[in-house]
Amino acid sequence: MVDKNLDIKQIQNIESFDILKKICEENNFFKYINKFALENLNLKKIKNFLIACIEEQNYSTNLTSLPYKLIVDPTNACNLGCPLCPTGLGASERKKGILKFGDFKRIVDESKDYCIELHLYNWGEPTLNKDLIKMINYAHQNKIWTRISSNMSLKYKDNYLEDLVTSGLNLLHIDIDGLDQEVYEKYRKKGNLKTVLNNLEEIIKITKDKSLNKPVLEVAMLAMRQNEHQHNEFMSFKKK
């Protein structure tokens, strides 16, 4: 628990990164951000992060901190029709749109002093935005850790995947909810498993050829009745 004797005014006056880091470690606050995002911390960011954590634990309503994690949707459009997703079902009343790079740049410029993590996805397929790689690179230049989640069920133009992998992206999440087309498309409707696997293989090849340690590749399967017989096989697939 947070030391009740340590108030926010005291923290605001601390000018030692190491002291602030120690307080975060003692209170296990770093669990709220990806461990690889710690490399982008500076004095201003860690101070805001610590204050935000204390305000959250104290259920504060009058906040002095700013958000240390942002979710920005490059688009709310998607190429799939997943039945449990409002976008896939067409249930959302929001008009489909694409985030312009100028608007994204403004968000980063306003948040770069305190934003630690940026998740560039929410209700759409982020790679449908032609400026996605440019967005990732701009966030990377401003020391912001980035993550996207993609279905990877699109045939991309030459060099797109290489540009994505070398953009500064920190983590790429891909859900593969079946190891054959019949099972895969029961949830990932309109998706093509072969395309996904080809893209995955190409990403792995690029990272190996260029000896890159990022993006971290996170592959997952949503556990459902139709794919439960493939769970063990999927765990073996992930290790390859």
Predicted regions and their residues:
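Conserved alpha-helical substructure of the radical SAM core
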Residues: 3-171, 182, 186, 190, ...
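Catalytic cores of alpha/beta
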Residues: 160, 225-239
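Conserved strand-turn element in the central/C-terminal portion of the radical SAM core barrel
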Residues: 151, 200-230
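Glycine-centered secondary-structure boundary/capping sites
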Residues: 58-63, 211, 227, 240
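Generic preference for hydrophobic/aromatic residues in regular secondary structure cores
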Residues: 1-3, 215
